[in-house]
Curated annotation (Swiss-Prot):
One matching Pfam family: AMP-binding_C
Binding positions for ATP per the UniProt entry: T263, S264, G265, T266, T267, G268, N269, P270, K271, D493, R508, K599
EC number: 6.2.1.2
Superkingdom, taxonomy of origin: Eukaryota
Gene: Acsf2
Protein name: Medium-chain acyl-CoA ligase ACSF2, mitochondrial
Lineage: Eukaryota, Metazoa, Chordata, Craniata, Vertebrata
List of residues that carry N6-succinyllysine: K182, K478, K544, K570, K599
Organism for this UniProt entry: Mus musculus (Mouse)
CDD domains: FACL_like_2 (cd05917)
Transit peptide location: 1-41
InterPro entries associated with the record: AMP-bd_C, AMP-bd_C_sf, AMP-binding_CS, AMP-dep_synth/lig_dom, ANL_N_sf
Amino acid sequence: MAVYHGMLRFGRLCIASLGARGPRTLLSRPRPNSKLQSVRALSSGMVNCTNPLPIGGLSYIQGHTDSHLVNTTVGECLDATAQRFPDREALVILHENIRLNFAQLKEEVDKAASGLLSIGLRKGDRLGMWGPNSYAWVLIQLATAQAGIILVSVNPAYQSSELEYVLRKVGCKGIVFPKQFKTQQYYDILKQVCPELEKAQPGALKSERLPDLTTVISVDAPLPGTLLLDDIVAAGGKEQNLAQLRYNQRFLSCYDPINIQFTSGTTGNPKGATLSHHNIVNNSMLIGQRLKMPTKTAEELRLVLPSPLYHCLGSVGGTMVSMMHGATLLLSSPSFNGKKALEAISREKGTLLYGTPTMFVDILNQPDFSSYDFTSIRGGVIAGSPAPPELIRAIINKMNMKELVVVYGTTENSPVTFMNFPEDTLEQKAGSVGRIMPHTEAQIVNVETGELTNLNVPGELYIRGYCVMQGYWGEPQKTFETVGQDKWYRTGDIALMDEQGFCKIVGRSKDMIIRGGENIYPAELEDFFLKHPQVQEAQVVGVKDERMGEEICACIRLKSGETTTAEEIKAFCKGKISHFKIPRYIVFVEGYPLTISGKIQKFKLREQMEQHLKL
């Protein structure tokens, strides 16, 4: 029997893809010019629920699955997992020597949630968590969800002006932090914004610059004007406070906002993407299903997480995936440390490892890399920025991570929308960010016309589905510019889709270099330079040029002990890539400006290069 679902779906989406121009633009066109004619009926044999295919030779795809989305809160998910696996190890904080099983974790989370309510925080209040990876971070993440409080994930590297910006933006009522980490003096930084703190009654702060902030909580030291987290958890253990928590939970909805995740700031001021229980619970459920977690034993579910918890990869892909699927979450260090990640794998028999490309490069380059035991590790996740094919191959071959998957997502999409299957081939993993996730739609559109592109033709990637954020907190206009009435989230990423539905990210629309009218995608050149035997890493940016508009600048980091010249690099390019893609400038660098989550800040790199080149 012929299945016409794809044609009907495509017809609706083709209209939606036009964004602000609306459906009338499409409907008024002469029928001969409509790409709708190219969509043919799909036979039932062509409909694949596990690996859906693009429709009609165009870059639109919809993810299918036999499982339904769930309408549960984070707290309900933790309760269910604790009931199923009470004695299974849930959380191991190696640098704090903390180990909890799921029953113990649930008990502590309930007490913390109850304690937060007992000090006057209420459903919908915003509570910032500011600090490195720690037991307190996981506790606050889960406790706020249990209590209906909105967690605000604050970058642990923020200084006073950045901190003031995010706390004011979302109207934080409270903030939690350790006294210090390395050179970061959290209490002193907050005092720069709130000099009133030192003399304030704990829990009753009145700040001129942060009028919403009343409650400051210290994780590890009694400090003037603050409440101590241990005292709050202890108070939460009282039966009357736990009873109040249970009463409050009757009024929680899975559609309530649970978390404000600030974008990484690779292009300017961060925006507060607001995510609900429904967003996060379902994304973590589907990530775990794609990783085959429901089929694995406790010994096969030991997830090593060196990534920061303030970022979606850590808090959703790490903490929530573990809580949903009964995996053991192993935090290897307070901030990223390649050696500590290797120690966690070796000593704790880690089976999964998460990280960004930059983190994996550092792990592979540890001087004593070969001394670690990789017999337990099977796979993991690489995400956060484009991963060069050579790096994917090195991880799989050198670390025994045959089930490694490449993941693509954005904070605004909760975050994962494309992901490999563990059984995908090495070439499929090295050449793409995987396939569409279930219950998610994706399309690639021409940035100038708004029409769907043909397969294997670059355009801007749009996403639609349950995963799309509720909006940017307090910024309705920016929300509408990003998620229009058609409900498509415009990623700003340039991508292409192949016949099997694999997606490849070729760059950011803002990073695309226009040199003398030619469009050049940095990711293509960055992958190319990694074929040079002496190149460890490459980043390509466009720098200003009076004649061409922009010129190409390749910022190259060489392998340890290697040397070469700009002339040799250019000679390597000749005959292998188009002449107009050969960089005018080759600059050798020791590193790149990074966000705390490991993403390269191209706009800062561009500024540095223009200064260096005196442009």
